[in-house]
C-alpha cells in the first residue's frame, strides 16, 4: 500500500480512538507538569512529583558524566581481567543510565530537556573539564579497587 500521497496524521487525530485509556504521546516540545517520564503514571499530575522527576533526571545526567570520566574507565597502569570486568560493568552502567536520560528527554517535556542538558553540563564541569582538576590527576595510575 502506497502511503506517499497521504497527508500526515495530526496529533489530534490520535486522540479520537474508541479506547478511552489511550494517552496521547507528544511529538513536539511542550511545557507543563502533566506528563509521563520513563514509567506509566510517573510523575503524574502532582507538582512535587514533577520536581522530583526533574531532580532525578538531573542527577542521572551528572552520574553519567561522573562515570564517563572516572578513573575506573581510563584504566591506566593495569591489565588484569578482574579490572577489565569492573571496567566493563561500569561502562555498561554508564550506557544504561545514558539511555534512561535519553528516554526521559524523548517525553518532549521542555523542563526534562533543560535539566538533562544542565545535568550533563554540570557533570562535565565537575568531572571532565579542567576547572576542578589538579594538573597531576591525569598522571595518576589506575587505583586499586
Curated annotation (Swiss-Prot):
The chain crosses the membrane at residues 47-67, 99-119. It comes from the Eukaryota. It is a multi-pass membrane protein. GO terms for biological process: copper ion transmembrane transport. It holds the Pfam family Ctr. Keywords: Copper, Copper transport, Ion transport, Membrane, Transmembrane, Transmembrane helix, Transport. One of its GO terms (cellular component) is plasma membrane. GO terms for molecular function: copper ion transmembrane transporter activity. It is found in: Membrane. Involved in the transport of copper. Belongs to the copper transporter (Ctr) (TC 1.A.56) family. SLC31A subfamily. This is Copper transporter 6. It comes from Arabidopsis thaliana.
